[in-house]
Amino acid sequence: MKEKFDLVKLLNILKKNIKLLLILPAICLVVSAALTFFVMPDKYTASTQILVNMKKSSSDLAFQNVQSSLQSVNTYTEIIKSPRILDKVSREFDGQYSTAELNSFLKVTNQTNSQIITVSVTTGNKSESDKIVNRISKVFAHDMPKIMSVDNVTILSSAHDNAVKVSPIVSVNLVISIIVGIVLAILIIFLKELLDKRIKTEEDVESQLGLPILGSIQKF
């Protein structure tokens, strides 16, 4: 019975503060929309895929060659991000991007047990993301045989105007802002109730003063 009473009291508190529950999420929504559309910069990611094959001698078996390539994938990913590659890319862009900037744009990944390396570049310009990731891949493919004993480096897919917008994600930002607004409103409401020590109802007299109710004066 007490649980039911507490639930009714909780709902009454929320109902009494319904304006705050509506206004605060709306404010958060408007602020989030303004930041998303007018302040937060757009980010675009372009990707390429690269396959690296190890050189094999006449005594090598195909399976051993594949296993060796798989074990070397982590090394390849580090080489792509190394100054040896990025310095050259920076020079080919006539210093428009420093090595540090290129490294900050770059992300290199690969799936487990796969020889395929995915090179991704994220910038604020769609066409620049395409250009940079393609240039990094070409420099790596050209220089890799000189760095390690590899048979060939194949660019499986290049970026051709296929950079995708990765941020800001409008729908996610707006939903999060509404949730934040609701949570803030509820926190404010219950904080206000906890700090308000005034006796407002007969139940407050019984719970706070421990006195029985003998009678009450009705409002007219």
From Swiss-Prot:
Where in or outside the cell it occurs: the entry states: Cell membrane
Q: Which cysteines are joined by disulfide bonds?
A: none
Gene Ontology terms for molecular function: protein tyrosine kinase activity
Location (main, coarse): membrane
List the GO cellular component terms.
plasma membrane
The keyword Isomerase appears for this protein: no
Question: Mind listing the GO biological process terms from this record?
Answer: capsule polysaccharide biosynthetic process
Concerning InterPro entries, the annotation shows:
Bact_polysacc_biosynth/exp, LPS_length_determ_N_term
Q: Which UniProt keywords apply?
A: Capsule biogenesis/degradation, Cell membrane, Exopolysaccharide synthesis, Membrane, Transmembrane, Transmembrane helix
Membrane-spanning segments: 20-40, 171-191
What metabolic or biological pathway is this protein involved in?
A: Capsule biogenesis; capsule polysaccharide biosynthesis
Q: How does it sit in the membrane?
A: Multi-pass membrane protein
Q: Does the keyword Phosphoprotein apply?
A: no
Stated family: Belongs to the CpsC/CapA family.
Q: What does the UniProt record say this protein does?
A: Required for the biosynthesis of type 1 capsular polysaccharide.
Cited PANTHER family? FERRIC ENTEROBACTIN TRANSPORT PROTEIN FEPE, TYROSINE-PROTEIN KINASE
Task: Please give the name of this protein.
Answer: Capsular polysaccharide biosynthesis protein CapA
Q: Which organism is it from?
A: Staphylococcus aureus (strain MRSA252)
